[in-house]
Regions:
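Histidine-anchored nucleotide/phosphate-binding helix
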Residues: 25-32
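Gly/Pro-rich active-site loop or hairpin
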Residues: 56, 166-171, 206-209, 213
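Non-membrane alpha-helical structural segments and their capping/turn regions in soluble enzymes
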Residues: 87-92, 177, 209-212, 216
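Metal-dependent polysaccharide deacetylase catalytic core of the NodB/CE4 family, i.e.
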Residues: 13, 33-133, 138-151, 157-166, ...
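Short, glycine/acidic-enriched loop or turn micro-motifs at the edges of active sites
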Residues: 21-22, 78
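A Trp-anchored, charged/polar loop motif used as the substrate-binding/catalytic surface
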Residues: 21, 171-185
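C-terminal domain-boundary segment and adjacent tail
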Residues: 1-7, 39-40, 49, 102, ...
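DG-centered beta-turn motif at the end of beta-strands
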Residues: 15-20
């Protein structure tokens, strides 16, 4: 049966949060639930996820995010540059997170984001083999990469591969309120805005840090301007995912 997808509305915003930072559960999720917003939380066991449970989620908290209706996505076991990994290493990293999710009763992740935004055709081929629906990258090459945040292109499903969805705005010290407004305004005429956050706050990685009060200002703006705020997997309501294209 052919799935009938909805027209892409203006002000369609995708929220993503990388690395499994503790604030995902303690601050971000309750605020998003208040407004009925969805989001994707991309989980890795790299960085200090396994060692520092004051700053990173426990797997029980990850399960809690899933039970609250949010999407849990795959961000690899080791958080390595996927372009430096062999095919076998990348597959092992992906399978590890899949199995950790399954062990906790979390649905098998359907979407992926590239650690450090790095991507290459070989990695895309692996994601395709693993049947991911969508994958999120960074701002480059359309916009210059800045490790403290910045602007990127809106996601245009007629132009961008579903396993190479760009980041329209990446939060960090280099990303201002004006940049946020600009990113939201790109969500029109069939384009979708994809926002990338890390910790709110991110004490381990200040170059991707977002102040809680600043984040609340962003979320209030999305609510006040009647934005539709979704997880990456929810794009399937509007956009043909990779597996459907392949089939």
């Amino acid at each position: 049966m052919i799935k009938v997808r909805l027209p892409i509305p203006d002000r369609l915003i995708v929220l993503t949060f990388d690395d499994g930072v503790k604030s995902d559960a303690t601050y971000v999720a309750p605020l998003l639930k208040k407004y009925g917003f969805n989001a994707t939380f991309y989980i890795t066991e790299g960085l200090n996820f396994l060692q520092d449970k004051d700053r990173y989620l426990t797997w029980e908290e990850v399960r809690g995010l899933d039970e609250a209706g949010f999407e849990i996505g795959n961000h690899t076991r080791h958080h390595k540059d996927v372009c430096t990994q062999s095919r076998e290493e990348l597959i092992a990293d992906l399978v590890h997170i899949d199995r950790r999710c399954q062990a906790k009763g979390i649905p098998l992740p359907e979407t992926f984001c590239y650690p450090g935004y790095s991507n290459c055709p070989e990695a895309v081929d692996v994601l395709a083999e693993r049947q991911f629906l969508f994958a999120r990258r960074g701002m480059a090459p359309e916009y210059p990469y800045h490790n403290e945040g910045g602007r990127g292109p809106a996601y245009n499903p007629t132009q961008h591969h579903p396993l190479l969805i760009p980041t329209t705005g990446a939060s960090g010290p280099n990303w201002t309120y004006d940049d946020f407004i600009w990113a939201v305004e790109q969500a029109r005429d069939g384009n979708i805005t994809v926002l990338t956050f890390h910790g709110v706050p991110d004490l381990d990685h200040p170059w991707v840090h977002t102040e809680p009060d600043t984040f609340k200002t962003y979320i209030d703006y999305l609510h006040e301007h009647d934005c539709t705020v979704i997880a990456v997997r929810d794009l399937d309501q509007y956009v043909t995912p990779f597996t459907a294209i392949k089939n």
